Amino acid sequence: MNTRINRRTLTLIPRFLVLGSLLLLCSKVAGQQMYQLTQFMLNNYTVNPAVVGTHNYFQARTNHRFQWVGMNDAPITNVVSVYGPLTKSPMGFGALFYNDITGPTSRTGLVGSYAYNIALTDEIRISAGLSVGFMAFRVDASKFDLGDNTNYATDPALLTFQSKTSIVPDAAVGVYMYASHYYVGASCQQLIGNTLTLYGHPVRENALRRSFYAHGGYLIYLSENFDLEPSVIVKWSPPSPFQFDLNVKATYLTRVWAGISYRHLDAVSFMIGYRHDNRILFGYSFDFSYTRLRAYTGGSHELMIGYQFDKLK
């Protein structure tokens, strides 16, 4: 009798390990569900759909982030966006794709955006925007490693544990007020707040919680060749605490820039970038964590590449 109980317990151990790992990953994602970019100020569309149509040209941006380099299964994020105005109309549209991977879990999303802007004064305009699309949350069972003695092909506890994907609709809204030398905006991501369903059960611990953003920046002309742009972003995803980034970016001849950023309770970042022929942009940032993570990671790297199309007439 005791032997049977022990064998059954041993058989169930791999399943408990898998489910425990999944719950830990879910709790991690719940704390930081939205992807994180250090160079957000170079592409505010990633945090606010109202930004589309606020420039008189189309632009494309790609961001590639490698977070906590040196740690196993650390997050890797890729974002691609294209957006711009509708010719001779106070509106714009765009599309954004992202893929955010953390160990055996990944979040992939695609949204289309529309925004309409009006003039408040001769200098100031305000835009309201909406994004609608989908998000796919995937658990890749092949990336779980339970040790050399586990037979994934024949173990009855693992036969039913396979890769699963939960696809849900997603949406975001935002407002954005801007002038030639400053901007301020607010948005809500994951507006619908869906609950993911995996293995036939809703994973309520990993419900898509609404995330609120407030961001702004101010351009200061120091001289004919130099300008300075401080910016800030505040993020809140209840019940998680507020988080904010403070940034300062200095630009020379509108071509070369360097900056520093402070992320509350997380990291200090350094940024450099170059604009070629007023069309192609290259940006790089490095995050140095000042938390306990600094003992286990070599920092976070992020690369941004952009292209600016001709101005619309």
Model-identified regions with their sequence ranges:
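Subset of outer-membrane beta-barrel
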Residues: 32-313
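Bacterial Sec-dependent N-terminal signal peptides
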Residues: 1-36, 248, 299, 309-313
